[in-house]
Amino acid sequence: HIEMLINWSDESPAGSAVGGFIPYLDVTATIVAKNGNLEIAKLTPHINIIDNFHYAQNIKLPGAIDEIYKVTIIIDPPSDGELGIHYDWKERYGSLLDQKVFTYTNLSFEEIALKSRR
């Protein structure tokens, strides 16, 4: 299970609930094992008690549990027609957000992969 908490920060547009979930985003995770194998997953909204709303997907690691991984998360604004953006927002901010790309390297998932939530 890979997940991202994507919430408004204190630097977000006026009127945004700081810490509030940002819905309708297009979130993709690319997980690359040291052996070169990769897994691409579209993260979709999930909800649970601990994290509340978040983007996630159940995945299989593309390599061994004890390998080192690189993960790239691409966050795109909603596709056309998925979110109505009112005139006042569009005039002030243009769009919900610009594409964001986050890359994390030298990750070990071994401890997490061997745990169980239940």
Residue ranges of model-derived segments:
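Compositionally biased low-complexity segments at domain edges in trafficked proteins
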Residues: F102-R118
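Short acidic/polar inter-strand loop motif in beta-rich domains
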Residues: I75-W89
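Short, aromatic- and glycine-rich surface loops/edge beta-strands on solvent-exposed regions
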Residues: D66-P77
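Short, surface-exposed loop/turn segments at beta-strand-coil junctions that are enriched for proline
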Residues: K60-D66
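Extended low-complexity, serine/threonine- and proline-enriched intrinsically disordered segments
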Residues: G20-N37
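Solvent-exposed serine/threonine-rich low-complexity stretches and specific carbohydrate-binding patches
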Residues: I40-I49
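Aromatic sugar-binding surface patches on proteins
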Residues: I50-N58
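Short amphipathic, basic-aromatic surface patches that mediate peripheral association
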Residues: I2-G20
